[in-house]
Amino acid sequence: YFPENSVMVTGYGFDMLYAGPREAILHAIFRQNMGATHLIVGRDHAGVGDYYGAFEAQEIFSQRVPEGALDIEIFSADHTAFSKKLGRVVMMNEVDGHTADDFVLLSGTKVREMLSNGIAPPEEFSRPEVAKVLMDYYQIEGT
């Protein structure tokens, strides 16, 4: 699924604190210290419900972190969705000529709910063999 020698996706064993924007900075520092060169900060990164603004965790890097204080590159991610037109996941603000019907949208909360109920997310979001592993995990977590 990824070209060889271009991307390394790894897990990071740190429990979420749900501390919002300041936790995003903490994640950047920890990952930088572990050798990461980039960090994707998504919508509502480390947030809980609607307590923090949807993009505050991205904004804090330009508003509160002095230039040059971090050696890790922050990638601010917008809303992501599967584009039916393009056949791939996209940042919604980066594609032209799309209407709401051209996207398949799922929130993380919705995906976890589906997995907990033994429902696989659409194949656009997860390979079936991965969805099976996740469903098994969430079903065990729910007991």
Give the positions of each predicted feature.
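Active-site cores that bind ATP or allylic diphosphates and position pyrophosphate for catalysis
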Residues: Y1-T143
